[in-house]
């Protein structure tokens, strides 16, 4: 009985050729070396998905390096403002990743103070509650929050981003001492240009 060669796609993950593939997918026929390579690959994949120190955003949510260079050039707020204004070709994906980072910077207690200062029937209370719920969701699982934001229609996402940016600006105006990392970078860039 002749043994067929193991499928190289199956060794490194999963073969998508189906019945058209003429190589062996039967692990019992594979030589020990091929089994070890597959086992090592699968164990590394499991380890990577469990390790919190490794940034798996790009694999899980599709955040590519392009998104990160846009963010580096424009800053988190710049990416979001560009997405709202439909400039700089910012994708929905990169806007959602930037939104998640902005939500990480925001403190829900500051927003609750702003909410408590509003009148009872003010429509802003609903906006504050929405942003607070996104902050809490992002704190628990930022990848899931990015996924939820991506599923929003574009106009709803833009409105949510605009409301969040307005809240972020009002908080930074009220608390000028609490500058975020992105704000300090912007101030440093402005000082260099003058």
Swiss-Prot record:
A zinc finger (C3H1-type) spans 1-28. It comes from the Viruses. Keywords: Activation of host NF-kappa-B by virus, Elongation factor, Host cytoplasm, Host nucleus, Host-virus interaction, Metal-binding, Phosphoprotein, Protein biosynthesis, RNA-binding, Transcription, Transcription antitermination, Transcription regulation, Viral matrix protein, Viral transcription, Virion, Zinc, Zinc-finger. Residues 126-163 are annotated as: Binding to the phosphoprotein. Gene3D superfamilies: Pneumovirus matrix protein 2 (M2), zinc-binding domain. Residues 76-171 are annotated as: Globular core. One of its GO terms (molecular function) is structural constituent of virion. InterPro entries: Pneumovirus_M2-1, Znf_CCCH, Znf_CCCH_sf. GO terms for biological process: regulation of viral transcription; symbiont-mediated activation of host NF-kappaB cascade; transcription antitermination; viral transcription. The keyword Phosphoprotein applies. It holds the Pfam family Pneumovirus_M2. Phosphorylated by host in infected cells. Only dephosphorylated M2-1 is competent for viral mRNA binding. Cyclic turnover of phosphorylation-dephosphorylation of M2-1 is required for efficient viral transcription. The record marks 8-9, 23, 92, 151 as: Involved in RNA-binding. Its main location: virion. The keyword Metal-binding applies. The modification Phosphoserine is found at residues 58, 61. Acts as a tetrameric transcription processivity factor that binds in a competitive manner to RNA and the phosphoprotein (P) to prevent premature termination during transcription. Transcription anti-terminator that enhances readthrough of intergenic junctions during viral transcription. Preferentially binds to poly(A)-rich sequences. Plays a role in the association of the matrix protein with the nucleocapsid, which initiates assembly and budding. Also, can activate host NF-kappa-B through association with host RELA. Homotetramer. The homotetramer interacts with RNA. Interacts with the phosphoprotein (P); this interaction is required for protein M2-1 function, localization in host inclusion bodies. Formation of a complex host PP1/M2-1/P allows P to target host PP1 phosphatase to the M2-1 substrate. Interacts with the nucleoprotein (N). Interacts with the matrix protein (M); this interaction directs M localization to cytoplasmic inclusions comprising viral proteins L, N, P, and M2-1 and mediates M association with the nucleocapsid. Interacts with host RELA. Interacts with host PABPC1 (via C-terminus). Contains a zinc-finger domain on its N-terminus essential for its anti-termination function. Contains an oligomerization domain. The central globular core is responsible for binding to RNA and phosphoprotein. This is Protein M2-1. It comes from Human respiratory syncytial virus. The lineage of its organism: Viruses, Riboviria, Orthornavirae, Negarnaviricota, Haploviricotina.
